[in-house]
Amino acid sequence: CGAVRFRDREPVSRELVARMTDTMAHRGPDDDGFYYDRYVGLGHRRLSIVDLGGGHQPMADADEKLWVVFNGEIYNFPEVRAELEGLGHRFRTNSDTEVILYGYKQWGKGVLQRLNGMFGFALWDCEREELLVARDRMGIKFIYYAIEDGVLYFGSEIRPILAAGALSRRVDPV
């Protein structure tokens, strides 16, 4: 989950991102992590499926210019990884998450056409100051988001957005 203050570009509250992330503790008991860059905050709770020791998130490329939070599984990551290694990319883990980073570095948004799996992720490109939020083609993994007062809030479930106070909890009378 995370938050981006795209309008005023003021720093994102660390307490806010921690509160958002804590709402997903039930989904990821194995690890948690955070990344902050100016007006961006990313938080992650991890359930270890692939690379039990090396998949800490948010995960960065070797230059720490790309950061990703990822939920799901990339089924064809060994094939995509082999292709990227053939193109000169060096991997530090055995995690499928890292394939997203180097795939984006190589192909940009075209990496989405190469990924087969069930996933949702948010990737922050520090140099371009761009956030790519994506999910699998079938929509197996969800991405929830809200934009309120110049801040984008997102998560793999609604709880982080509610914890951020970005949505009211009133019933729609219609």
Which residues are covered by each model-predicted region?
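Cysteine-centered catalytic environments shared across enzyme families
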Residues: 1-174
